[in-house]
Amino acid sequence: MTGAKPTTTGLTLEEGPIDRKAIDTLRTLSMDAVQAASSGHPGTPMAMAPVVYTLWQHFLRFDPEDPIWPNRDRFVLSMGHASMLLYSMLHLTGVKAVDARYERLGELSVTLGDIERFRQLDSKCAGHPEYRWTSGVETTTGPLGQGVATSVGMAIAARWQAARYGRPGFELFDYDVYALCGDGCMMEGVSSEAASLAAHLGLSKLCWIYDDNHITIEGPTSLAFSEDVSARFRGYGWNVLHVADANDTGALARAFNGFRVTKDRPTLIVVASHIGFGAPHKQDTSAAHGEPLGEEEIRLTKRQYGWPEDAKFLVPTGVREHFRDGIGRRGKALRNAWSARFEEYRKVHPDLADEIERMQKRALPEGWDRDVPTFPADAKGLAGRDSSAKVLNAIAKNVPWLLGGSADLAPSTKTRLVFDGAGDFEASTPSGRNLHFGIREHAMAAILNGLALSKLRPFGSGFLIFSDYARGAIRLAAIMEIPVIHVFTHDSIGVGEDGPTHQPIEQLPGLRSIPGLLTIRPADANEVVEAWRMILALRHEPVALILSRQACPTIDRTRFAAASGLRQGAYVLADAKLGKPDVILMATGSEVSLCLAAWEKLTAEGVAVRVVSMPCWELFERQPEAVRDGVLPAHVLARVSVEQASVFGWERYVGLGGASIGMRNFGASAPLQELQQLFGFTVENVMDAARQQLARARKA
């Protein structure tokens, strides 16, 4: 919260009656849609309509005919509950739809019928904006703070793309990133993480617009929020501008111009507003925030606007044409000029032009995996993080837009790109491929989303235990179906002496529970190779790659099944004679080798044993039933799972009568070997569990 409340003198538009009519159309469509849905948030659209109108109509470089034009300005509605403001703008400006293959369609992204069915099944106007569902929505928002943090990733992408592809006479990437946010975003910790990093990097193409309306759901912000936001952001190093009244479009224009001329830091525009502007009984109250105004209040508000009181979903004559002649005409001219410039660029820099086109289509360069190593059998082996480092560097040098970093843990997660020319991304070296997120796991994950939404292939790394800090942003990546790569190391009690605070237990099942997220825990170096190959080929799925700190034996693939089995999620690694097992041992990661050692001994005893490596449950569940039954035959009831994590979820595969060797409490601080003995991760314990399962199955 900052500054004084605005006056209630109403609109002070400079352009004329059509501008007020356009602004009030945004307001009334929002009010009517929320009322029709019997749920939603009318107050912020009513307050911020002049702000969004001024930005879109006069400043935003955006062509409604092509909402995925690469050099468009990005607009992020971080306070996603105000979604009707964005939907109304998408409709009135005539934004066209784009399909999942990034093909432009002729139909409107948002029709008036969609607005009338706000928050209803299959309407393009969902309760909160959803990327890929509604064209023109740059990122899914709703959880407060996520949008502004994601916008930092977009601004980093803009800076990197400009540095990578800009050449004398060809400035191809100079887009701005705007994010509209409120008190809720400012209170969420992720916004602080992201704002701090944005200032450090000098992201001058980034503008946050702060709706300072003094109201939250419970009442006035004074109940829980009294900091000076302007001072806080000046402390970060931002340029801070103020607009005393959200209805003053002239002041708004001056603020946006002030952002544009700022070249060394991001900008925060603090806009004082009235939530529920014009509502005679609910303006400036929490009642205007998250519920319909009511029919009578809407009539009175429309009277205040000079609007037909009983008209619903009214778009007056001339409003659509006004937007078409403003943002529509300007955006089309800018896009056409950019397209012509790109064709000239292609003639001079054909290889770079090809890169840009592949990047935009999420395609890969020819021969991108030609340098990927294979690893010989080795009883000592490599830690998952070490083999991953080799594979990642081999791939990244051939995929120029693959970049990333860690939350101050690259020496431990082994994710630093070390080939010639990789470099660090900093304010003074914006073409670097190594990002330094600092100790900001949540912001890192949200920033990765912004990078991916800008068509880069980002990766971020940290310890698996701290994936909890990033979970909100990981979940949004899955909802959006964007190919973000999360590399989580130190994956188990193998962390050893660091103790239970750093030993992940419940994190693996937690990540597996996120729909659409692939969680992969490779068994050895060659499964790591296959994991990276598969990950890079993905276009619409985020991944959590789970890697060990301790060494894992490199399995002899001349004796056991090929690591390419990872692609089906689970595969038979070692089998009984004639492929007819009496007991199945299944595991992920470092515990696969433990099962192989038990297989050797049990086989020598004459037991018919199968070992199944299960690096990715999600991929396995997608396989045809015949494939799944071929790996885990239904008639084999004797089953044992082994994983240094919570046993939660394993009953799906071992059955209610099966055995799961895993963690049922938190770990302890001790050397790894002692912990393995303590918690039963030994060859002898696996063998005993197998024998007990066989005995149980024979009695069944």
Predicted feature residues:
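A short, small-residue-rich loop immediately preceding and capping a beta-strand
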Residues: 37, 73-74, 137-141, 170-188, ...
